[in-house]
């Protein structure tokens, strides 16, 4: 599926099969989960995408060909995941200080390089992950962005005991499971009046769930905002205890309104999360099967990607949309 221009439907099109260059894997794709970032790209909310573009960055597939100088840890037939961060230069001040997620020359899968809404993709082997055997090809796909970016956001809350989560979509649902596994007190904020989602959060184990316009029964040590809604930032600040942190976990957010300095005072912090690092992935794919994190998915054939987009925009999905692309000769 190809995006020719933002704000236009994706087009089903035959494209040339890619060939792996030095350090790259050729991957036959079996599934690719749909992320809200894909919508931001398709809707023109993120600047300067590669065009025409094959979207998708939660890619699960099997290695079909290995390019020159690929590490011996990868072999033909291996199942791999291809995430958002697709390449960094390894030389800049950020890469040399273990902050490759901030590399000025970074390339991003399904944004500045072609992604996974296709039968094949090439990817830099350094940024591919071996995936836990516990999960099948559909279950594991949402972990490659909602899980990874969510986990990086979660790490920024350190050892905060009282954790608030604003928005209870894909990433929040995954990270809530880790927080509960690690013994955090979880407070979940949804759209005002969304009793169904609040009940779902409480059934999962949240100590409290309410609307984003409510104050929690206790002050929070940290809050993660997964919804791309700027006014949630001052709302979360007001719910924080002294010294607390608000982590903005999305790549895009509507404008943040002004707020009194008193809401920020007493060493409260607002921070964003950008992209991910390979270390994030290694840690996350180690802990995910131990929790074990469970994913909720709804599948679509590749050619119905536009339908998946429309249902995502309308809030009509029952779980993470996952595109089914090829069985690749594998039963999983």
Q: Residue ranges of each PLM-predicted region?
A:
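Cysteine-cluster motifs in flexible loop/terminal segments that predominantly coordinate metals
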Residues: 35, 83-129
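Glycine-rich cofactor phosphate-binding loops and adjacent beta1-alpha1 units
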Residues: 187, 195-269, 330-332
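Glycine-rich beta-strand-centered segment in the early N-terminal region that forms part
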Residues: 16-32, 45-93, 127, 132-135
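Local beta-strand N-terminus motif with an aromatic residue
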Residues: 77, 219-221, 305
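Mid-domain Rossmann-like dinucleotide-binding core that forms the NAD(H)/NADP(H) cofactor-binding site
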Residues: 133-213
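C-terminal hydrophobic helical "lid"/dimerization subdomain
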Residues: 181, 278-332
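Residue-level marker of beta-strand positions
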Residues: 58, 78-79, 94, 120, ...
């Amino acid at each position: 599926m190809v995006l020719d221009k933002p704000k236009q439907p994706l087009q089903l099109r035959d494209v040339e099969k890619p060939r792996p260059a030095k350090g790259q894997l050729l991957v036959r794709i079996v599934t690719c989960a749909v992320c809200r970032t894909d919508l931001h790209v398709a809707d023109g909310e993120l600047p300067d995408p590669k065009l025409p573009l094959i979207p998708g960055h939660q890619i699960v597939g099997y290695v079909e060909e290995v390019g020159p100088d690929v590490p011996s840890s990868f072999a033909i037939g291996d199942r791999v995941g291809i995430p958002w961060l697709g390449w960094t230069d390894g030389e800049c001040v950020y890469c040399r200080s273990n902050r490759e997620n901030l590399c000025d020359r970074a390339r991003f899968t399904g944004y500045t390089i072609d992604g996974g809404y296709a039968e094949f993709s090439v990817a830099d082997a350094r940024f591919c992950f071996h995936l836990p055997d516990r999960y099948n090809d559909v279950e594991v796909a949402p972990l490659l962005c909602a899980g990874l970016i969510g986990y990086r956001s979660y790490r920024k809350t350190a050892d905060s005991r009282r954790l608030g989560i604003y928005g209870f979509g894909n990433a929040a649902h995954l990270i809530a499971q880790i927080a509960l596994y690690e013994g955090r007190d979880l407070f979940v904020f949804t759209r005002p009046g969304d009793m169904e989602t609040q009940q779902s959060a409480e059934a999962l184990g949240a100590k409290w769930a309410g609307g984003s316009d409510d104050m929690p029964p206790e002050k929070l040590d940290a809050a993660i905002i997964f919804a791309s809604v700027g006014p949630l930032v001052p709302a979360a600040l007001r719910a924080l205890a002294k010294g607390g942190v608000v982590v903005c976990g999305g790549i895009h957010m509507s404008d943040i309104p002004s707020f009194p300095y008193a809401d920020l005072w007493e060493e409260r912090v607002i921070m964003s999360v950008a992209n991910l690092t390979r270390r994030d992935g290694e840690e996350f794919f180690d802990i995910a099967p131990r929790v074990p994190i469970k994913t909720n998915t709804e599948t679509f054939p590749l050619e119905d990607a536009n339908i998946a987009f429309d249902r995502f925009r309308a809030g009509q999905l029952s779980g993470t949309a996952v595109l089914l692309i090829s069985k690749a000769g594998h039963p999983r």
